[in-house]
Swiss-Prot record:
Pfam families recorded: ATP-synt_ab, ATP-synt_ab_C, ATP-synt_ab_N
InterPro entries given in the database record: ATP_synth_asu-like_sf (IPR023366), ATP_synth_asu_C (IPR000793), ATP_synth_asu_C_sf (IPR038376), ATP_synth_F1_a_nt-bd_dom (IPR033732), ATP_synth_F1_asu (IPR005294), ATPase_a/bsu_AS (IPR020003), ATPase_F1/V1/A1_a/bsu_N (IPR004100), ATPase_F1/V1/A1_a/bsu_N_sf (IPR036121)
PROSITE patterns listed in its UniProt record: ATPASE_ALPHA_BETA (PS00152)
Keywords: ATP synthesis, ATP-binding, Cell inner membrane, Cell membrane, CF(1), Hydrogen ion transport, Ion transport, Membrane, Nucleotide-binding, Translocase, Transport
Name of encoding gene: atpA
PANTHER family xref list: ATP SYNTHASE SUBUNIT ALPHA, MITOCHONDRIAL
Binding site residues for ATP: 169-176
Protein name: ATP synthase subunit alpha
An example Gene Ontology CC term for this record: plasma membrane
One MF annotation (Gene Ontology) recorded for this entry: proton-transporting ATP synthase activity, rotational mechanism
Subunit organization: F-type ATPases have 2 components, CF(1) - the catalytic core - and CF(0) - the membrane proton channel. CF(1) has five subunits: alpha(3), beta(3), gamma(1), delta(1), epsilon(1). CF(0) has three main subunits: a(1), b(2) and c(9-12). The alpha and beta chains form an alternating ring which encloses part of the gamma chain. CF(1) is attached to CF(0) by a central stalk formed by the gamma and epsilon chains, while a peripheral stalk is formed by the delta and b chains.
Length: 513
């Protein structure tokens, strides 16, 4: 074989011309120590706070401590393979999670990776988990209701779209049950739901998912699970990841509801991370910025006006407001709402639903304490008919609590006091509601109407629950059109009052309970 020198020189010339000698500047560092989900890195001079870091074998971390000669980072996911001396690279990005309609109906981890075995999720894009909350000018007032389907809440502590309403109580008082019922009631309302489970047992989360599937609510719900077996860093970022997924819907002129179950465990996870990073501890060993941890999260729940939606969608959506409603859950110890984290979150939110152990154990479920529960902005969002009828119920319960305490000491009570006590007892019974049994506005209105107008005064106390069930069965069979009309319009006037009275009189005449 003959080699032609001119061909070789031509080939070398072509190679030299095509050679790209551009230098690439990269910010790299070296692992100094690793353990307990925390990594200390030497180098990374230009790293930013909260920046995503790339470790070997597709492992990521987040820079949280920027010190003079090292960087403290939390590791997200498995870190057993990371050794001292390993190379760490800056990414120039902050942590992002996938968002979009494709996420609905799926169970994902804190980084948006599917964990339900249903294959990969094809989303339109991703959003950073940390965002600045909407400003005052871009917000709209809270004047549309979020119906939970629970009489005790919708009548006494109403929730509006864009509100933050805290659910607070000891362990085993039905906090998650209230939140799950609220999600189930949204299946036909068009409100998208996000359930963020922080530090829960995987079996508990699986049970919630199964219940949502059984009641047809999983199709418009995203479940973000950072279980008890996950690292503290994953539990810390999970609520922010869920919030970013909810903001996607809000910014497109839709309504979303997000449940954080629960923020106590997120605060514990953040405390653990902070102590491992050797940050100075404060009250109850929490770091100094634990208030900011929750305030920057909950301030992102809001209702934004139509101009802001139009700006965020580049003119695609016009004339529609968007909202993200938050129901954070806080677990108290022995009913102590004056502890550090509970007081922080109470001061951030627009009201709280206080669930009491004594009420729960005595069979009042949902165990809402009407005296300590309050909704600071929900009143203007409440449905007209429920607002009108619910006021009497709240008053009856308040008087009952006062008189019940007084009647323990007084032996002879006058007739008016006795009547108030009896009506209060029956109203308490009417406020009871089974789990996974949300009621429509029409059904709720009739139950409140029965309590207000004295239709249950002559019903035995132990028959009240049966009376309510029989009443609702009768109304669904005989007055379905009226129920539908009340649910759709929410109006309350003399005509509707007369129709409701007529239906109640006919039911009472039959005595079918």
């Amino acid at each position: 074989m003959q080699v032609n020198p001119s061909e070789i020189s031509e080939l070398i010339k072509r190679r030299i011309e095509n050679f790209d000698a551009a230098a690439e500047a990269r910010n790299e560092g070296t692992v100094v120590s690793v353990g307990d989900g925390i990594c200390r890195i030497h180098g990374l001079a230009d790293v930013m706070f909260g920046e995503m870091l790339e470790f070997p074998d597709d492992t990521f971390g987040m820079a949280l401590n920027l010190e003079r000669d090292s960087v403290g980072a939390v590791l997200l996911g498995d870190y057993q393979h990371i050794k001292e001396g390993a190379t760490v690279k800056c990414t120039g990005r902050i942590l992002e999670v996938p968002v979009g309609d494709a996420m609905l109906g799926r169970v994902v981890d804190a980084l948006g990776r599917p964990t339900d075995g249903k294959g990969p999720i094809k989303t339109e894009g991703s959003e950073p988990i940390e965002k600045v909350a909407p400003g005052v000018i871009t917000r709209e007032g809270v004047d549309q209701p979020v119906q939970t389907g629970l009489k005790a809440i919708d009548s006494m502590v109403p929730i509006g779209r864009g509100q933050r309403e805290l659910i607070i109580g000891d362990r085993q008082t039905g906090k998650t049950a209230v939140a799950v019922d609220a999600i189930i009631n949204q299946k036909d309302s068009g409100i998208k739901c996000i359930y963020v489970a922080v530090g829960q047992k995987n079996s508990t989360v699986a049970n919630v998912v199964r219940k949502l599937e059984e009641h047809g609510a999983m199709d418009n719900t995203i479940v973000v699970n950072a279980g008890a077996s996950e690292s503290a860093a994953m539990q810390y970022i999970a609520p922010y990841a869920g919030c970013a997924m909810g903001e996607y819907f809000r910014d497109r002129g839709q309504d979303a509801l997000i449940i954080y179950d629960d923020l106590t465990k997120q605060a514990w996870a953040y405390r653990q991370v902070s102590l491992l990073l050797r940050r100075p501890p404060g009250r109850e060993a929490y770091p100094g910025d634990v208030f900011y941890l929750h305030s920057r999260l909950l301030e992102r729940a809001s209702r934004i006006n139509a101009e802001e939606v139009e700006r965020r969608t580049n003119g695609e959506v016009k004339g529609q407001t968007g909202s993200l409603t938050a129901l954070p859950i806080i677990e108290t110890q022995a009913g102590d709402v004056s502890a550090f984290v509970p007081t922080n979150v109470i001061s951030i939110t627009d009201g709280q639903i206080y669930l009491e152990t004594d009420l729960f154990n005595s069979g009042v479920r949902p165990a809402v304490n009407a005296g300590l529960s309050v909704s600071r902005v929900g009143g203007s969002a409440q449905t007209k008919i429920i607002k009108k009828l619910g006021g009497g119920v709240r008053l009856a319960l308040a008087q009952y609590r006062e008189l019940a305490a007084f009647s323990q000491f007084a032996s002879d009570l006058d007739e008016t006091t006795r009547q108030q006590l009896e009506r209060g007892k029956r109203t308490m019974e009417l406020m009871k509601q089974g789990q996974y049994e949300p009621q429509s506005v029409g059904e709720m209105a009739f139950v409140l109407f029965a309590a207000n107008e004295g239709y249950v005064d002559d019903v035995e106390n132990d028959q009240v629950v049966r009376f309510e069930k029989a009443l609702l069965d009768y109304l669904r069979a005989e007055h379905a059109e009226l129920l539908q009309r009340i649910t759709e319009t929410g109006d309350y006037n003399d005509e509707i009052h007369a129709e409701m009275q007529k239906a109640m009189d006919a039911f009472k005449k039959n005595r079918t309970w």
